[in-house]
């Protein structure tokens, strides 16, 4: 099968198509992880994006549904240097997603690093694509709207409330689902925290009706400025119970606190990002997947810059205490992914911190009855 990648600047890259015979548009990004292609493809945060893997060999250990981060592939397309085995090909085919191999992924990555993320089109076809069609494809890419203008979260958020009971329940939390990864839910459940997953547009009254011990605002795709409704809900929750966030959830909390976000040139996507904990001085290697960040010059007043990225000094975490006398006033969030999926487990202890925070709040509630 033939494959072609078309960029908005007119660059055309030809290769071998695999997966589904299809044509997709999306923002072109790269991921530096050496493993985890199944987790990456099924991560809802990649909705609207065509993913280039910098590691050259993909597909060489098969596909297993136990690795899924959602119910199916969420990335628009997949770009690799070498594709091995039939399982990855069949996987993409099953979900109608095209892939392209036998291309210079180093060239693509360097282009993204120098020019920034770009609009792109990936097409696979049983017949060779003519030069005339190439011109039409370039026009399609140029007329495609910017990902910042697309509201991507509604496409990946749950449409109904879903409850996940922990085997040995200690506490419970509400996860505001902006595209939550299964690994995040698993990390909570493994620690005895039952989860109520709610749609991204759920109001604070309903969230509080579940009597959670804390709220987690999840990861997800797209521009956080599109999530002002969710940010307003989160703002209304401040001071009523502990609020935490991961990735997009961190950015939403930033906005809810009165801060601002901005788009990174090419984002952080991979499992090798060093992050410094400002309070301890310790450095963790983290998994990341985001194209936006908190504006460091506009960190919300009274907030603590808790974590910093050592590669580019971007904000990796903030915290704020609304009420020094009560744990219900605690707000904290991180930009990186402590659950990994894929990546290092250096920051996994943050889920222990979440559960400990929830336990403390639960004890406070009980003592006041």
From Swiss-Prot:
What EC class is this? ligase
- Pathway membership, UniProt: Amino-acid biosynthesis; L-arginine biosynthesis; carbamoyl phosphate from bicarbonate: step 1/1; Pyrimidine metabolism; UMP biosynthesis via de novo pathway; (S)-dihydroorotate from bicarbonate: step 1/3
Q: Where is this region: CPSase?
A: 1-168
| Keywords assigned | Amino-acid biosynthesis, Arginine biosynthesis, ATP-binding, Glutamine amidotransferase, Ligase, Nucleotide-binding, Pyrimidine biosynthesis
Question: Signal peptide location in the record?
Answer: none
Amino acids binding L-glutamine: 45, 220, 222, 248, 251, 289, 291-292
- Provide an example Pfam family for this protein: GATase
Tell me which domain of life the UniProt entry assigns to the organism this sequence originates from.
Archaea
Q: Which InterPro entries match?
A: Anth_synth/Amidotransfase, CarbamoylP_synth_ssu, CarbamoylP_synth_ssu_N, CarbP_synth_ssu_N_sf, Class_I_gatase-like, CPSase_GATase1, GATASE
Q: What EC number(s) would the UniProt record show?
A: 6.3.5.5
The catalytic activity, as recorded, is: hydrogencarbonate + L-glutamine + 2 ATP + H2O = carbamoyl phosphate + L-glutamate + 2 ADP + phosphate + 2 H(+)
* SMART domains xref list: CPSase_sm_chain
Q: Which GO terms describe its biological process?
A: 'de novo' pyrimidine nucleobase biosynthetic process; 'de novo' UMP biosynthetic process; glutamine metabolic process; L-arginine biosynthetic process
Q: Name one GO molecular function term.
A: glutaminase activity
What family name appears in the similarity comment?
Answer: Belongs to the CarA family.
The subunit structure is: Composed of two chains; the small (or glutamine) chain promotes the hydrolysis of glutamine to ammonia, which is used by the large (or ammonia) chain to synthesize carbamoyl phosphate. Tetramer of heterodimers (alpha,beta)4.
Role noted for this protein:
Small subunit of the glutamine-dependent carbamoyl phosphate synthetase (CPSase). CPSase catalyzes the formation of carbamoyl phosphate from the ammonia moiety of glutamine, carbonate, and phosphate donated by ATP, constituting the first step of 2 biosynthetic pathways, one leading to arginine and/or urea and the other to pyrimidine nucleotides. The small subunit (glutamine amidotransferase) binds and cleaves glutamine to supply the large subunit with the substrate ammonia.
The protein's name in its UniProt record: Carbamoyl phosphate synthase small chain
Instruction: Report the source organism.
Output: Methanococcus vannielii (strain ATCC 35089 / DSM 1224 / JCM 13029 / OCM 148 / SB)
What is the gene called? Answer: carA
